């Protein structure tokens, strides 16, 4: 089992001069980041899906073995609350499947208000595993009912 270490993104202007050299262009931040870390979360996919050309540019900026961990769209987790999300999952994975060799786990962060419901969760996981078995997933439950 490989251990990958990274952060929840690489595009932080506060890092310039601290992590990133002062003279480096923002367009080169990911390439520089990938010399120090070997994975990163893609947080923007939670808010809106990146364009395919953007994802391709990211893929070209990192070495083989680097892993991107895209965060599942909030439309799936927070708006639809895991129900009736097949079309939304298709849109999400269509963006990232071209770089599947660079994908780490997909982060599924649930809203703090989403209580555990066995039927909803089972149907969601079943649809993921049936249609997208090649991916790995990390589920972040944030409501106390998930503990039981």
Language-model regions, residue ranges each:
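Residues lining hydrophobic/aromatic ligand-binding pockets adjacent to catalytic sites
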Residues: 1-148
